[in-house]
Regions:
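Glycine-rich phosphate/diphosphate-binding loop of Rossmann-like nucleotide-binding domains
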Residues: 6-45, 152-237, 287
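Adenosine-phosphate binding glycine-rich loop
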Residues: 118-159, 269, 274-370
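An N-terminal-biased, well-structured beta-alpha scaffold segment characteristic
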Residues: 2-110
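Rossmann-like adenosine-cofactor binding region
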Residues: 209-292
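Short glycine-/small-residue-rich Rossmann-like dinucleotide-binding loops
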Residues: 69, 75-76, 95-96, 221, ...
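Hydrophobic beta-strand scaffold residues
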Residues: 33, 57, 91, 114-115, ...
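Glycine/serine-rich phosphate-binding loop and adjoining beta1-alpha1 elements at the start
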Residues: 2, 8, 79-170, 298-300
Length: 370
């Protein structure tokens, strides 16, 4: 199979979908790997390293896309890439289609087969290809939140850990999944006063045991969220409904009631965000103000730490990429139900229910395509 690895062109996106180790694995199995010139530089991987691993380097994105039976990416295609999508090609990347109807329509029109990292789901309902990026985004959230809390950044001027004799910042984490727990880990490590909310009390028991009393757990409902958010210096939104648009849990009116200079970091922004006033921002302009509060809504947070996140991502995507290359998409999906759940679009049909619901497009059951 001919595998294409284009350079990521989203704003300040420095990750790459395949490392030299991955290229070596695929080429040693008899596949051809085509990497766009400079694709790895943001992650400090040179073209020479790919060449040494058996890949071929091509100068232009058009050439790379044209060569590939399968395209490996990190982020969803953006508008300038839509014309490169074509029937008979398999695209394996993060898609987050519930929050992006134009992309969904472009994929449907192209006839391509699109498999989304974020909807691959194991029998225990965990999301193996989303988890490492949730870990990275979760651990980044208190870091960017702390920076945004500084007065020159527009924040309250609060040090997360306080100092002896001065109270620490109050950090509220909404959502006790992978991102939320990783956010709480770093916030606790900074010395902040941390509260975490989740609707699942069993999950809160696990978190309570894990942190041994170093944070407070709270059963999540609209009243509990309102009380916690009003008192918070930093709110981290980490709510995920697999494949679907995130629920809006913090209203505009509630933000107006918050302390001036408080900060809200929305990790759920790539699924539409979990604060009412959230809208996607970039690493170039990460924040904006709402009612004297600072919103940080960067949709590709892990892109800021590519040396970490490229390797974290490819560690988990490579086995699936190998299966797709070795068997072809149809056989690979029939052999692995978890990977089959990753299929979002095939030959003009939308096979993911939550995406169809969020975008108002027609749903074709997965079984009819496999």
């Amino acid at each position: 199979v001919r595998i294409a690895v284009p350079r990521e062109i989203k704003n300040h996106e420095y990750r790459v979908a395949l490392t030299p180790a991955g290229a070596h694995e695929l080429t040693s199995r008899g596949h051809d790997v085509f990497v766009e010139q400079g694709a790895g530089l943001g992650s400090a991987i040179t073209d020479e390293e790919y060449l040494a691993a058996g890949a071929k380097i091509l100068a232009s994105a058009d050439d790379v896309w044209a060569e590939g039976d399968m395209v490996l990416k990190v982020k969803e295609p953006i508008a300038v890439e839509y014309p490169r999508l074509r029937a008979g090609q398999t695209l394996f990347t993060y898609l987050h289609l519930a929050a992006d109807k134009p992309l969904t329509e472009a994929l449907l029109a192209s006839g391509t087969t699109a498999i989304a990292y974020e909807t691959v789901q194991l029998p225990n309902r965990s999301l193996p290809l989303l988890a490492p990026m949730s870990e990275v985004a979760g651990r980044l959230a208190p870091q960017v939140g702390a920076f945004s809390l500084m007065k020159p950044s527009g924040g309250r001027g609060v040090l997360p850990g306080g100092v002896p004799g001065v109270a620490p910042a109050r950090v509220v984490v909404i959502g006790g999944g992978v991102a939320g727990v990783n956010a709480a880990t770093i916030a606790v490590g900074m010395g902040a006063d941390v509260q975490i909310l989740d609707t699942n009390v069993d999950r809160l028991r696990q978190i309570d045991a894990q942190f041994q009393g170093r944070l407070r757990t709270l059963a999540s409902n609209s009243f509990a969220i309102e009380q916690a958010v009003r008192e918070a210096d930093l709110v981290i939104g980490a709510v995920l409904v697999p494949g679907a648009a995130a629920p809006k849990l913090v209203s505009n009116a509630l933000v107006a009631d918050m302390k001036p200079g408080s900060v809200l970091v929305d990790i759920a922004i790539d699924q539409g965000g979990c604060f009412e006033d959230s809208r996607p921002t970039t690493h170039a302009e990460p924040t904006y103000d709402v009612h004297n509060s600072v919103f940080y809504c960067v949709a590709n947070m892990p892109g800021a730490v590519p040396r970490t996140s490229t390797y974290a991502l490819t560690n988990v995507t490579l086995p699936y990429a190998v299966a797709l290359a070795d068997k072809g998409w149809s056989q690979a999906l029939n052999d692995d139900r978890s990977l089959a759940l990753g299929l979002n679009v095939h030959a003009g049909r939308l096979t993911n229910g939550p995406v169809a619901e969020a975008t108002g497009l027609v749903h074709t059951p997965l079984e009819t395509v496999l």
